[in-house]
Amino acid sequence: MLDPRILPYYDPAVERKIAVVTGGNTGIGWYTVLHLYLHGFVVYICGRNSHKISKAIQEILAEAKKRCHEDDDGSSPGAGPGPSIQRLGSLHYIHLDLTDLKCVERAALKILKLEDHIDVLVNNAGIMAVPLEMTKDGFEVQLQTNYISHFIFTMRLLPLLRHCRGRIISLSSIGHHLEFMYWKLSKTWDYKPNMLFTWFRYAMSKTALIQCTKMLAIKYPDVLCLSVHPGLVMNTNLFSYWTRLPIVGIFFWLLFQVVGFFFGVSNEQGSLASLKCALDPNLSVEKDNGKYFTTGGKESKSSYVSNNVDEAASTWIWTVHQLRDRGFDI
């Protein structure tokens, strides 16, 4: 797998590199933030719970310091120059609730006031296979959290990304393949049993995110837009709904443990695809825009549905109209 130490390091005293990461306080996002910080980035961690993010920041600071000392001691030799205490970035918290579009706009506005450019936007946050629920904005909760809120967040921050020819990395999932034919996003799959049809809702949201990435690459060719499947990361809060179910929760816990043992990757390994897309200098808008990467940063191909440009355009148009109907101009 990719060793992130071979990727470029920046000196924040010389060059101010800015990254924005949604859901950066746990799991894959935590390690994405850690490595961006080690590489000299000013990182804005966007999430709902200030206490959890403050705790995550302290843990990341401690882990980064530990890794810098290990690298200095030669106990953890890498292929690249390695991190340095003198070249670490900085970490900041932005309140972001993806189930509230007005909150999403406020978060973007705050960043617009704080910075004049963004080098990397990582749309990392998401939920998976939860019960059917509608948000206050009138969208199915998985669709809004995984796709629609990230759509409007990205569009609001786009001027800062275009200012420095930045990069947009959106975390999809291999689960998007469950959308085996194009479904209108207004379809909620309100059928029983939920434990079956919730996966179709999840697949729709992750397919839409890839389609959005494809359309961004077409509409804004000066920004590198990429989508990733991080790998089968089983040690994640995404599965908490299933493992906490009465009676059958223990069955799902055992199932996820077995799948993780044979096929899974760690949270840090799951962050590698995002890190490659964010930092690899060999990626360019000319040859890589709109591509899809999988575990460890390997280039791959997403589903037929997600690659269909006409259907991607339909998803884009539907999203813009839905947001305008709710008072959000795109």
Swiss-Prot record:
Q: Tell me the Gene3D superfamilies matching this sequence.
A: NAD(P)-binding Rossmann-like Domain (3.40.50.720)
Q: Which residues cross the membrane?
A: 27-47, 245-265
Membrane association type: Multi-pass membrane protein
Q: Name one GO biological process term.
A: vacuole organization
Q: Where in the cell?
A: Lipid droplet; Membrane
The positions flagged as glycosylation sites are N282
GO MF terms listed in the record are: oxidoreductase activity
Q: Which positions are annotated as binding NADP(+)?
A: I28, D97, N124, Y202, K206, V233, N237
Consequence of gene loss (knockout): Exhibits lumenal vesicles within vacuoles suggestive of vacuole fusion/fission defects. Leads to internal accumulation of precursor CPY.
For whether the record's keyword set contains Transmembrane helix, the answer is yes
Q: Name one Pfam family in it.
A: adh_short
- The record's account of how the chain is modified after translation: N-glycosylated.
NADP in keyword set: yes
Quote the catalytic residue positions.
S172 (proton donor), Y202 (proton donor), K206 (lowers pka of active site tyr)
Q: Which domain of life is it from?
A: Eukaryota
List cellular component terms (GO): lipid droplet; membrane; mitochondrion; vacuole
Which family is annotated?
A: Belongs to the short-chain dehydrogenases/reductases (SDR) family.
Which function does this protein serve? Answer: Probable dehydrogenase required for replication of Brome mosaic virus. Involved in vacuolar processing and morphology.
Q: What is this protein called?
A: Probable oxidoreductase ENV9
Organism, by scientific name, is: Saccharomyces cerevisiae (strain ATCC 204508 / S288c)
| Gene this chain is encoded by | ENV9
